[in-house]
UniProtKB/Swiss-Prot annotation:
Domain of life, per lineage: Bacteria
Keywords, alphabetical: ATP-binding, Cytoplasm, Glyoxylate bypass, Hydrolase, Kinase, Nucleotide-binding, Protein phosphatase, Serine/threonine-protein kinase, Transferase, Tricarboxylic acid cycle
Subcellular localization(s) per the UniProt record: Cytoplasm
UniProt name for this protein: Isocitrate dehydrogenase kinase/phosphatase
Main subcellular location: cytoplasm
Length: 578
């Protein structure tokens, strides 16, 4: 290779990332217009388009590099010099951290995810940690109650860029003040002030004002979801001020926010104070930088591995028929490998399973489907693998494993947030906790269905419980769109003997689903059956599912709330007039 080519390649990669992030910001900047026009289908399409941008631009850069090098192979020294030149371009670069991830992605595409070493890749960042502790321009604006909280909130709302008419601004402000007074008390509230992010966070059918409530005793989240009435008027649906509530809003089972972030590291650093339980990976994920979130997730895994003496074990729960799932006992993630062969009743291919996981990545997850990171050629030290798990890996996924002596390489796997399997949770709880779990499960099914997702396999073992008690779906191999399913009533038996026969007395075609049968799987436990009949009996009726299908086909997009119905101002305070 001619000398000087290394710098050209480094510059080409960085320019490619510039182009990618420019398009990322362009798609994001359209969020306000889509919200104001109530174009909810365009919201969904923009989300999918933005997810695809990264891989598309990686592909463009790879083609450029193949032209530059005329397809010639490169030696190790050449690659090290390319990375060295690239590193020198980053100290003054505003999106250095994602630029490093982009470099990694280009390298992996060029070399088929092989030789992934710290010398060749940015396994850890080359730049100082938390470089944006001080930021080049303010991300937020402070508001003080010099003339009272009503005046303060009027200024906050008047500063918003939204151009639609407000339904009742005075009412919403009084709702917020009432909530803050109940939360803090009048004296503490008078000594508190707000810091509000300059940019709104858009997702689904809401625009979120995100801020910090700075009180004498500490800083709290301050989140206002702004919605539209059917007449296109704005209203504030609630006010959330606890870290638990904020954590759910920014949760791993939700779609990514559309928020204009030319300095993503600075925004992540700003958010960290009101989301202390979120990892760096989860914060990047929440603002839509999912590929860099994957980098950060891998770094978090490496840091944990270096500081523990644990071995990987099979994950607790009922063993899956499609996926082999393992974990580290103290780590909050699970690792999922597609088995070489599936159970006979699972008539599908590995390609189908991967397509299902990609569908979930691109779809609105409505807070009910766990996000995943996909890895290729994932290296594990054998000393970190328990003998029982090693035996299981070789038994169930040998075709995906390469033995390197002291290491193994798993050709393909997913990493996902670890949860307590719902079937295990239900065995361990009683009383109100049991009731809450069944209510959550039914709500999860309803919200998935309203978002045009049918889980396929609705058994409790395919759902997990988060640390906030939310029920989330995580087994995607039978997932499909609601509109692809034929929901049928079971025909009445022709003769009394029909009900005793081993075979059904009616025809069953692919895609047929009989909701009446759900009762047999979900209500067998006498503790659970009555709760189901009380709260979710309509899930056992085919006409319920068909009605949802009709709404989806008519183009209706349901509202998705990242909080309980009882927290909505309209429920808490009613239509109080001010």
């Amino acid at each position: 290779m001619p000398r000087g080519l290394e710098l050209l390649i480094a510059q080409t990669i960085l320019q490619g990332f510039d182009a990618q992030y420019g398009r990322f910001l362009e798609v994001t900047s359209g969020a306000q217009q889509r919200f104001e026009q109530a174009d909810w289908h365009a919201v969904q399409q923009a989300m999918k388009n933005r997810i695809h941008l990264y891989d598309h631009h990686v592909g463009l850069v790879v083609e450029q590099l193949r032209c530059i090098t005329n397809g010639q192979s490169t030696d190790a020294e050449f690659l090290l010099r390319v990375k060295e030149h690239y590193t020198r371009l980053l100290p003054d670069y505003p999106r250095f951290e994602i630029a490093e991830s982009f470099f990694n992605s280009v390298y992996c595409r060029l070399f088929d995810h092989r030789s992934l070493t710290p010398e060749r890749l940015f396994i850890f960042s080359s730049q100082p940690e938390r470089r944006f502790r001080t930021i080049p321009r303010p991300l937020a604006k402070d508001f003080h109650p010099d003339h009272g909280w009503e005046s303060l909130l009027m200024r906050v709302i008047s500063d918003l860029p939204l151009r639609l008419h407000w339904q009742n601004k005075s009412r919403d402000i009084h709702y917020i003040i009432r909530h803050l007074t109940e939360t803090l008390g009048p004296e503490n509230l008078s000594k508190s002030h707000l810091q509000v992010a300059n940019e709104l966070f858009y997702r689904n059918k809401a625009a979120w004002l995100v801020g910090k409530l700075i009180t004498p005793s500490g800083t709290l989240p301050f989140l206002l979801p702004i919605h539209q009435t059917d007449d296109g008027e704005l209203f504030i649906d609630t006010c959330l001020t606890t870290t638990a509530e904020a954590s759910i809003v920014f949760g791993f089972a939700r779609s990514y926010f559309m928020v204009y972030a030319p300095l993503p590291a600075a925004l992540v650093e700003w958010l960290r104070e009101i989301l202390p339980g979120k990892t760096t990976a989860e914060l990047y994920m929440a603002i839509g930088c999912q590929k860099h979130a994957k980098t950060e997730s891998y770094r978090e895994y490496l840091v944990y591995l270096q500081g523990c003496n644990e071995q990987f074990i099979e994950a607790p729960g009922i063993r899956g028929m499609v996926m082999l799932v393992f974990t580290l006992p103290g780590f909050d993630r699970v690792f999922k490998v597609i088995k070489d062969k599936f159970a006979p009743q699972k008539e599908m291919s590995a390609a189908h399973v991967r397509a299902c996981y990609q569908l979930v990545k691109e779809h609105d997850r409505v807070g009910r489907m766990a996000d995943t990171q996909e890895f290729e050629n994932f290296v594990l030290e054998k000393r970190h693998i328990s003998p029982a798990l090693m035996e299981l890996l070789l038994q169930e996924a040998a075709e995906k494993i390469t033995d390197l002596g002291e290491q193994i390489v798993i050709r393909h796997l997913y990493i996902e947030r670890r949860m307590v399997p719902l079937n295990i949770w239900l065995e361990q709880v009683e009383g109100q906790q049991l009731r809450d779990a069944i209510e959550e499960y039914g709500n999860a099914i309803r919200q998935l269905a309203a978002a045009n997702i049918f889980p396929g396999d609705m058994l409790f073992k395919n759902f997990g419980v988060t640390r906030h008690g939310r029920v989330v779906f995580y087994d995607y191999d039978e997932i499909c769109y609601m509109t692809e399913v034929n929901f049928r009533d079971i025909p009445p038996p022709r003769y009394p003997e029909d009900e005793l026969a081993s075979e059904p007395w009616y025809s069953v075609s692919p895609g047929d689903v009989f909701p009446e049968e759900f009762r047999h799987w979900l209500c067998a436990d006498p503790r659970i059956g009555p709760l189901f009949e009380e709260m979710h009996a309509d899930l056992f009726r085919a006409d319920y599912w068909r009605a949802l299908q009709n709404r989806i086909r008519e183009g209706h997009v349901e509202d998705v709330y990242a909080y309980r119905r009882r927290q909505r101002f309209s429920v808490r305070y009613g239509e109080m007039l001010f």
